[in-house]
Every structure is written in C-alpha cells, then in structure tokens.
C-alpha cells in the first residue's frame, strides 16, 4: 500500500498477488469484468466493448475482489482499537453489494469446478471463452510445485485433485504438450495414474468415458427403497452425502457414459501408465493412492464393498427399475425446490447429468440449470472457480451487521443507510415455506428459516437462522431502523430452531442427526471423515444459545419454558463436548480457536465466565497457552486432521487472533495484558487502507477439506476490536 503523491490524501491499494508464469498467458482484461447481484445471487459478466466498459465504470468492490488497484481517501494509521474499527469499517462497508449484502468466494476444494465443467461438456453446453480463460488461470495459479493439485488449495497433490483438473484443463482447450499438462501428467503417473483415483474420481471419469464402470465400487440406488426408519436409507445420512449419492447411484445404475470422441480417446491414453485396453478394471475398485486415502480401509469396509459387488451381480431387475425411478424423483424434486441450484455445486453437476440422461438437453431442467451455472462461480484474484456453495450471502451479511452492533457503529447516523439495506436483504432472504414433498425427499422443514446463501437455495441452517434472528432483534430496537421483520416471522424462526435440536441437546447444521454413528464404518469416500451423518457442532449450538437468549430478552412471553429447556440442554452439550485440552473443536472453521470463541460466547450468555465456571477457566488457559510472542494466535488447518492444536507454520494470523480475543473477552478473562497484546496485533496488521490482508484458508468443509472465508478477517476482527473498546475502553496501544 502506498500514498499517491499526485493525489493528495489518497491511498492506492492493490492485493499482494501476481499470476504465476503459466497462469499469466490465460488472463483476460480484468478491467472488463463486472459483478451483477440479485437478492444475494452473484453473476460475473465480461463487457465485450470499450463503450460498455466506459458507461459502467468498475466499482471499488469489483476492483478489490479482482486484485486491481483501487483508490481510497487516506486515513491516519490507527493507534487505538476504536480508530482501527473506524478505519476497518470505512474499508469494509465499501464491499457491500447493490442489493445490500456482503458476498465473497468460498472456494477451496479443487474438484468442484472440474465436476461442473465436465458435466457441462458432456451435456454439450459451451462455456464462454473469457470464463474458460479465467478458469485456466485459476488452476494454474493454485497448482502445486510438482504440477499437481490436491483435495483443496494449499494441500499436497493427490490423484483425485490432479486427474480432475487435468481433465478440466483438457476440456477447456489446453493441449497435452502444454508444459503445465506434461508436468501434471508426470505427477499423476507417479502417484499411480488415474487407476488409483478414489471412488469419487472414478465416478467422474466413468461418466466422461475415460474409465470403465466395472472398476467402480458399486453405487446401487436400492437403498432408496429401504424403509425410511432404517439407517441404510439415504434419508438418515448427512444431507450433502445423501444428495451426491442419489445422483451418482442413478448414473451408476444406468451405466451412463459420454460416447467416445477424439478428446475421450486422447484422455484414455494420457491418464494411465499402462494401455487402456490392458487394464484389469475389477482390480481397480479398491485401488486408491496412498496420497488420497485418509485412512486404510477396515475389514468392515472391505466386506461392505464385497457385499455390494455381489449384490450387483445378482440384482433384481424390477427393484432396480423402481430404485432408479425413485432416484430420479428425488433429483427432480431437489432441483425444483432449489430453483435449479441444488444444495451445492457438487451435486448440481451430477444432478445435471442425471436430468440430461432422463430428459435430454432441450428440457426445462437443463435450460434452468444452464442459467444457474454462473451462481457459484466467483472471479477472485487467482481466476474463476466455483465456491463450495452458491455464495455466503446471508451468513456474511448477518456477521457483518453483528460486527457493527458490537463496535457501536450501527447507532451512528452515517451508517444507518448501509445497514438498512443490509436489513432489507436479510428480510428478503427468509424462507417462507416448506419444500415440496418435504418428508418424501428427506428435507427438514424450512418455513421461517434463513439460509446460508440465498433464499432460492432454500436449505435451512441452524446457525445462519440463529445469527439472522439475533441481528434482526438487536438492529430493529436501535432508533432509526424500521421493524421490517414482524414478530410472527421471528417466532416462526424460533419454532424452526427449536425443532432442529438434537435429542439430548446440541445442534447440527442442516437437520438433527438422523442416523447412528456406526454408519461411518461404511464410509467409502476414502477422502473424508464424519460425512455419513450430520454431527453436533459447538459452533452451531453456541449461535443458537446467543440467539435464544437475545430473543427471550425481547420476547419473554413466547415459549419461555421451551426456550429455557433448550438452553439448558445446549449448555450441557457444550460442557460435555469440551476437549481435555480446554478448547472446543470446530468443524466449520480453523479450528480450536474458532469453536472456543463460539463456546465461550454461548456460556457467557448464560452468565458463565472465568470467575464462576471451571470450563471457562480451562478454555481461557488453553487460549493463553497458545498465544504467540507477537501477541497473536495462529492455528494450522492440519489441526482438523490430527485433532490437536497445531501452530500455523507462518505464525500469527488475523482471524485466529480475532477468535481468541473474542473468546477471552466473552469469558471476562482476567489477563487483560494478554488480551491487550492480541488487540495490538490486530491493529498492527491493519493496512493503510483500513483492510486486513488475505491469509491462509479460514474455513473447513467435510474434514479435512479447507475453504476460504475471506470476509472473516473483517467482521470477526471488527467484533474483537469493538468488544474490547466496550469492555476495556479506548486506550492507546503501543504498536
């Protein structure tokens, strides 16, 4: 960051990022890209003509996310927490979109975009040339030094990541002799070639026609016919696993593959270390590279695979037909309920292929999904890639509003127009009805819920609903804000939240846990853990506690006994889920610092803190134990896999420091000096523009996968600084 001497009082900012040499040849003119939004929806558009670009100048928001230079009025560098809050907010408020929300990419997994590109190629829908270029640029910016790709960005190369993205780049037009492709191919062969890809990769290669279905672990659709009360029915599984499995089983049951063409024939030669015709396909079913496999298969998993193979040999034709019809019904209803989005891009891609097989390319199903292809795509500094969902619109907006309330910014007249727009977006995002066929298609009721992303996506999430209700109650009682969301609608949301509680207390994300934990013994993904059923999460539970206590103060006569009973059980869950080290373990953020922040806030809502609660004392000791000499905290994503706190190799990180400070403040930790040092670190890391720079992956999705949540460095940091000022005052910090 630097001050431009030709423009007094102006700071010129630019992301500290540059393309790799391989990626630079694919870049488009980034000054031509514009972001269109509609009720949380994101659609990046390339303006073809100079006249169009001139008539619609690029916004600050667009320049920031693309990594282009931007201009801001210069502000004095902060020397205290309140000044840092004001500088940070002056920057972050400019990232609000025209429809009132804060959005961003939540990319990270390196198989999401490739699945969507493969599906679109098979269906025969061309991709715009500028999008193709930016997709290539992204992959060549995040490629590993050995030329391969991992399960997610910043992870070691795997067969799955490398083969999926190799196929994607070939589809997008890169030739086999391109240096990047030759290097990727060498890594792929060194790791075992495409023969050693996990089941998920084998599926995508099968539908593309570059792998044979006999080499797949069977994915029969018949579990859909099992009584819904039994754990083997997909309705008992985690919602993402369920959605992916249903469409995969449909395509497996039909042995759907793209007819061979020149590219398919070429890939059959390029992906393998032995001739395609000589491969013993049944022997490849359990051939998974050590680089991909999370754990060795158990005897139960091996026996389960053998049983599936035997069943496939002796399957009953009329049951198979019924099961395939049921799978198609489930896919159609999912697509209809989500307005052609599907719960996430991963199942969007496989659902698109199933609907293409059933109804053809000219059907309304494919036309609708073609128009939704752009929704999860985000053009970031590295290029264009699909996010894990169709965005984070509601989640990030609710957290941003909470940050402004905590920092005392919401009550300031100059901020109310911005926050009224945010409130309007939150208002428009509430889901007002249940899904069609709610019970038949295993959906959780959604009437009154708020989604993670957009209303069209239509899935209820416990913590996003809780965070939305909390900020609505807090914001609507500040003078100057309209009561847009009625008491009745808030009560519907509370009813929904109470209905999502698990037996014995605690909250999952999308729906209460439905299946027994032994289902994890049958996990054949090879890539992930704890993905067969939903789980209890301290993060979600704590958000609900904060929501219910906030709501109960404002509406003390609405279901007080039910709310109090839920709060009591939720606290019990938090206490029994605390780790022996004193922290709580997160499944959605990194990791102990993230969950411990939430848990301490939840306990604080019930009046528990370091002075009167042994759990809070242990948690404070845990956080203080891991503070770095510079005052910050830095936790590695590897913590997710190894289940123990691992310091980040690059030292302190802004997000982890913000989490720790928020947790210690919530617990009323008596070590004021440690908190002050953490706050000083956050102030020191702030740039002249008021921003905080991007860091390592902030989020987790399906352990051990990492994801980006780039807005976390803004709203959690603003929360930490604002709460520090509210509790300890605005003292000058020695930076």
From Swiss-Prot:
Give any Gene Ontology cellular component.
lipid droplet
- In the record for this protein, the PFTB repeats are positioned at 132-173, 490-531, 567-607, 616-663
**GO biological processes:** (17Z)-protosta-17(20),24-dien-3beta-ol biosynthetic process; ergosterol biosynthetic process; helvolic acid biosynthetic process; secondary metabolic process
Q: Does the keyword Lipid biosynthesis apply?
A: yes
| Known catalytic reactions | (S)-2,3-epoxysqualene = (17Z)-protosta-17(20),24-dien-3beta-ol
Under Gene3D superfamilies, the record lists: 1.50.10.20, 6.20.120.20
Enzyme Commission number(s): 5.4.99.32
**One GO molecular-function annotation for this sequence?**
lanosterol synthase activity
So what family is this one in?
Answer: Belongs to the terpene cyclase/mutase family.
| NCBIfam families registered for this protein in UniProt | squalene_cyclas
Protein name, entry field: Protostadienol synthase helA
Organism of provenance: Aspergillus fumigatus (strain ATCC MYA-4609 / CBS 101355 / FGSC A1100 / Af293)
User: Highest lineage ranks of the organism?
Assistant: Eukaryota, Fungi, Dikarya, Ascomycota, Pezizomycotina
């Amino acid at each position: 960051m630097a001050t431009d001497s030709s423009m007094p009082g102006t700071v010129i900012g630019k992301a500290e990022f540059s393309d790799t040499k391989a990626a630079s040849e694919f870049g488009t003119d980034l000054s031509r890209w514009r972001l269109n939004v509609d009720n949380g929806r994101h659609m990046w558009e390339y303006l073809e003509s100079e006249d169009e670009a001139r008539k619609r100048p690029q916004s600050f928001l667009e320049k920031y996310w693309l990594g282009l230079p931007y201009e801001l009025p210069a502000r004095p560098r902060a020397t205290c927490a309140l000044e840092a809050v004001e500088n940070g907010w002056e920057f972050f408020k400019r990232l609000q979109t025209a429809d009132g929300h804060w959005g961003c990419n939540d990319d990270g997994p390196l198989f999401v975009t490739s699945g969507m590109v493969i599906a679109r190629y098979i269906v025969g829908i061309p991709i715009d040339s500028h999008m193709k270029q930016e997709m290539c640029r992204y992959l060549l910016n995040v490629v590993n030094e050995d030329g391969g790709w991992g399960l997610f960005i910043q992870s070691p190369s795997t067969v799955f990541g490398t083969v999926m993205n190799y196929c994607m780049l070939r589809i997008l037009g890169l030739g086999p002799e391109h240096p990047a492709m030759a290097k990727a191919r060498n890594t792929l062969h060194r790791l075992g070639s495409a023969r050693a890809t996990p089941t998920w990769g084998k599926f995508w290669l099968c539908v593309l026609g570059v792998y044979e279905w006999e080499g797949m672990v069977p994915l029969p659709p018949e579990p859909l016919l099992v009584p819904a009360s039994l754990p083997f029915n997909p309705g008992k599984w985690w919602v993402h696993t369920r959605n992916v499995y249903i469409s995969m089983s449909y395509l497996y049951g039909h042995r759907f593959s793209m007819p061979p063409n020149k590219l398919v024939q070429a890939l059959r030669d390029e992906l393998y270390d032995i001739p395609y015709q000589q491969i013993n396909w049944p022997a490849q079913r359990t051939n998974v590279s050590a680089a991909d496999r999370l754990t060795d298969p158990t005897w139960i998993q091996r026996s389960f695979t053998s049983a599936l193979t035997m069943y496939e040999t002796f399957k009953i034709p009329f049951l198979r037909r019924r099961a395939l019809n049921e799978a198609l019904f489930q896919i159609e209803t999912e697509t209809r309920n989500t307005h052609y989005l599907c719960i996430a891009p991963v199942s969007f891609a496989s659902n698109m292929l199933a609907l293409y097989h059933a109804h053809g390319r000219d059907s309304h199903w494919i036309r609708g999904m073609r128009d939704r292809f752009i929704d999860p795509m985000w053009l970031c500094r590295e290029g264009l890639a699909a996010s894990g969902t169709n965005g984070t619109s509601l989640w990030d907006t609710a957290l941003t509003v909470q940050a402004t309330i905590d920092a005392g910014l919401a009550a300031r007249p100059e901020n109310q127009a911005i926050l009224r727009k945010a409130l309007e977006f939150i208002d428009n995002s509430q889901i007002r009805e249940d899904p069609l066929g709610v019970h038949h298609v295993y959906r959780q009721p959604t009437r009154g819920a708020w989604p993670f992303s957009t209303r069209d996506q239509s899935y209820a999430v416990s913590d996003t609903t809780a965070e939305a209700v909390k900020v609505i109650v807090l914001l609507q009682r500040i003078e100057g804000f309209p009561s847009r969301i009625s008491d009745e609608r808030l009560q519907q949301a509370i009813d929904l939240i109470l209905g999502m509680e698990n037996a014995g207390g605690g909250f999952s994300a999308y729906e209460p846990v439905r299946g027994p934990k032994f289902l994890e013994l049958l996990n054949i993904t090879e890539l992930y853990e704890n993905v067969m059923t939903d789980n209890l999460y301290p993060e979600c539970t704590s958000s609900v506690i904060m929501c219910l206590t906030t709501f109960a103060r404002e509406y003390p006569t609405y279901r007080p006994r039910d709310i109090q009973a839920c709060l009591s059980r939720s606290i019990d869950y938090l206490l029994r889920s605390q780790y022996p080290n004193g922290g709580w373990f997160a499944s959605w953020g990194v990791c102990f610092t993230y969950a411990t922040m939430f848990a301490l806030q939840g306990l604080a809502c019930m009046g528990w803190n370091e002075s009167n609660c042994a759990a809070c004392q242990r948690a404070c000791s845990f956080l203080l134990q891991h503070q770095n000499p510079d005052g910050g905290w830095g936790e590695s994503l590897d913590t997710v896999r190894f289940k123990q706190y691992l310091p980040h190799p690059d030292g302190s990180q802004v997000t982890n420091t913000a989490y720790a400070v928020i947790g210690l403040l919530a617990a009323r930790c008596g070590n004021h000096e440690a908190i002050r040092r953490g706050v000083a670190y956050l102030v020191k890391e702030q740039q002249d523009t008021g921003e905080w720079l991007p860091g390592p992956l902030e989020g987790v999705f399906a352990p051990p996968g990492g994801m980006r949540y780039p807005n976390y460095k803004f709203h959690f940091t603003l929360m930490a600084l604002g709460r520090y000022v509210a509790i300890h005052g605005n003292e000058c910090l020695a930076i």
